[in-house]
Amino acid sequence: MNLRSVPGMYRSIQELGEIFDREDQAQKLVDEFTEFYNEYKQKNEGKDHPKVMILMGLPGSYIIATPNSYVGSLVELAGGENVYSDTDQEFLTVNTEDMKTKEPDIILRAAHALPDQVVEMFNKDFAENDIWQHFDAVKNGRVYDLTYEYFGMSATFKYPQALEELQPILYPESDADTQKAKENSDKAQKDAKDSGASEKYDEIQKSK
């Protein structure tokens, strides 16, 4: 199964349809995706593609998500230009000085595991590490947290919600879009804090 991108997920569905003699059902799903994406893509035709940097947060650290990762593929589907696209790896470990040279228009922050810890880590680092204050994306208020249920490590059928969330972030055409992007980011951060993921993880560890 190729779950690193939405198209990859649907290619896998087609392959499984052939294996299990379910070609018609598989093709129906593929056709639904094609119709959805063609309509979505038309909304952004002719628009400038913003430069985007994606931070995938882990407890205690973060890495860069490239277009070869699922989150990166979603941003690419939405028309964003990943500033770390010249690689065949899914994720990169990069220092903030190198990130600064890329000058992204937008910084997206996603959480892989224990989202409650990750959002606190991001907030602390962006507040205390002075270099972030020199990024144009930070100066311009274009740093956004993403809903962890939509922007994980593997493709899911929640990609329409993910693309809808990216729309006002990448292409704000009005004050209402800018406000919506901020509200979505605030909600994503609140949901992460309220997830109770760390507590659940501790309970699992204690039960072993």
Q: Which ranges hold each PLM region?
A:
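Short, solvent-exposed loop/turn elements at domain surfaces
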Residues: 60-65, 109, 116, 152-155
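Short, conserved clusters of charged catalytic residues that mark active-site
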Residues: 35, 91-94, 127, 161
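Extracytoplasmic substrate-binding proteins
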Residues: 1-60, 81-84, 139-207
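Acidic/His-rich segments in extracytoplasmic proteins that coordinate ligands and/or metal ions
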Residues: 1-19, 94-134, 168
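Extracellular/periplasmic catalytic domains that process cell-envelope and extracellular macromolecules
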Residues: 45-48, 76, 100-102, 135-139
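Serine-centered coil/turn micro-motif
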Residues: 68-69, 129, 135, 156
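Histidine- and/or cysteine-centered catalytic micro-motif in compact active-site loops
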Residues: 57-59, 67, 87-88, 104, ...
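Alpha-helical, coiled-coil/dimerization segments enriched in small aliphatic residues
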Residues: 63-92
